[in-house]
């Protein structure tokens, strides 16, 4: 028999049927049935704990291991064998009665220790959460500062570029002024030449006029004709 089939039979016969019978005992308020199924659940809880341990040790090599588990469950449930009642009265109840005080003390210490441990974990988690929130806030502030620095640096770069372009324009204007000054300094020479040429031309014109005046003076004037009466 496979492990899956045995597990299915154990769950069906060992839990569902006893759960329904326990419901019937509670609903009818039958004290005898109630005690009977309470003893079964105590024994079945101990069996479930031991089963998980034995499966790690016996499941791979012990012959008919899964079949024996099914037989044991039916032995506990059977009204003829009354296996759960026998185990509870012969072994479980005397053992629990002997170690009841030790078990209660162990449970109480475990309860207090678990409470203290829970409080420690809670305080540590609060401190950790506080640190995480503070670190997140610091990171957010740092990112904001970095963004502001980037924006300021971008503005500075833009202003530097504007100043640089202004300086370049000023230098170009100064160069243009210097070039115009040099052109103005070079330009009077041809003007002087032109003025000298104009002066020479005026002189020639004046000399020509003088010569014409002298020739006109030297030519004898013709006598005026007398009018004919």
Swiss-Prot record:
<feature type="transmembrane region" description="Helical">
    <location>
        <begin position="34"/>
        <end position="54"/>
    </location>
</feature>
<feature type="compositionally biased region" description="Basic residues">
    <location>
        <begin position="188"/>
        <end position="202"/>
    </location>
</feature>
<dbReference type="GO" id="GO:0005881">
    <property type="term" value="C:cytoplasmic microtubule"/>
</dbReference>
<feature type="region of interest" description="Disordered">
    <location>
        <begin position="179"/>
        <end position="229"/>
    </location>
</feature>
<dbReference type="GO" id="GO:0071782">
    <property type="term" value="C:endoplasmic reticulum tubular network"/>
</dbReference>
<dbReference type="GO" id="GO:0005789">
    <property type="term" value="C:endoplasmic reticulum membrane"/>
</dbReference>
<dbReference type="GO" id="GO:0008017">
    <property type="term" value="F:microtubule binding"/>
</dbReference>
<keyword id="KW-0812">Transmembrane</keyword>
<keyword id="KW-0472">Membrane</keyword>
<dbReference type="GO" id="GO:0071786">
    <property type="term" value="P:endoplasmic reticulum tubular network organization"/>
</dbReference>
<feature type="transmembrane region" description="Helical">
    <location>
        <begin position="57"/>
        <end position="77"/>
    </location>
</feature>
<dbReference type="InterPro" id="IPR004345">
    <property type="entry name" value="TB2_DP1_HVA22"/>
</dbReference>
<keyword id="KW-1133">Transmembrane helix</keyword>
<protein>
    <recommendedName>
        <fullName>Uncharacterized protein T19C3.4</fullName>
    </recommendedName>
</protein>
<dbReference type="Pfam" id="PF03134">
    <property type="entry name" value="TB2_DP1_HVA22"/>
</dbReference>
<comment type="similarity">
    <text>Belongs to the DP1 family.</text>
</comment>
